[in-house]
Amino acid sequence: PTRRSSDLVSTNKKENTQGGLSSYTHVKEDISIMLRTNADNTIEQHVFTTMFDFYALPSNFPGYNEAKEIENPYECIQHLEHSFSVAIEDKRFIPYFQLHEFEALLFCGIDSLVEKYPKCKKNCEQLTNVLQKFGNPELINSNPSTAPSKRIINAIEGGKKQLYKYNKPATAKAVTANIGIDVLRSKCPHFNEWIEKLIAK
C-alpha cells in the first residue's frame, strides 16, 4: 500500500508574516526543488499543487497577460492554470488559483463570520448583499478596494466606532474550518473542481 501524508509549504518563509507572492521565479524554484527531491516509488506516490490568490498575482506568471484579457473569470483561471502546468512540465503537478482570493471562501458562511465577530452582525449584512449580487463567492471581484478581504475588513472594522481589529489569517482559518469543505465545494465550482482533481490522483 502507498503511504498518505501531506506537507504544506508557505510562499513566505519569514516569521510572523501572512504569506504573499513576490515573484513567479521564486515559486518555480521552490516547486522544482520539491519535484526533484520527491521521487515516486512503490511506497510513496506524490501529488503537488498550489493555492495562490488570483488577486495581486505577480504579472510574470506564465500566461498572465493573456489571462487578463479573458473576460470570463473561469476561462481566465483555466488559461492561467494550463499555462502554469505547461511551464512546470510534470504530470504530478496540479496548479490551482483561488478566485479571486482565499477570503472569498468566507462568503460561503457569513454566519460563521458573525459568530466570531457578533457585534458586527449588522455590518455583515452588506456581505450577504454582495454575495447575492455576484451569485457565488468566486465571482466577487478583485478590485483593490472591493476584493473579498477588503469587503470583510470593512464590515468588521468599519463604522463610526471600531469594535474589532480584524485578524486576517486567524479568522480565515477558523471560519473556513467551521464552514467545512463540503459547503465550500458546493458553493465554489472552481474550488470543487480542484478537490476532485486531487481526489482522482
What residue ranges belong to the model's regions?
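C-terminal accessory helical subdomains adjacent to catalytic cores in phosphodiester-
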Residues: 7-15, 31-201
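Short, small-residue-biased leader/transition segments that mark boundaries at the very start
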Residues: 2-5
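N-terminal beta-loop-helix "entrance" segment that forms/cooperates
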Residues: 10-26
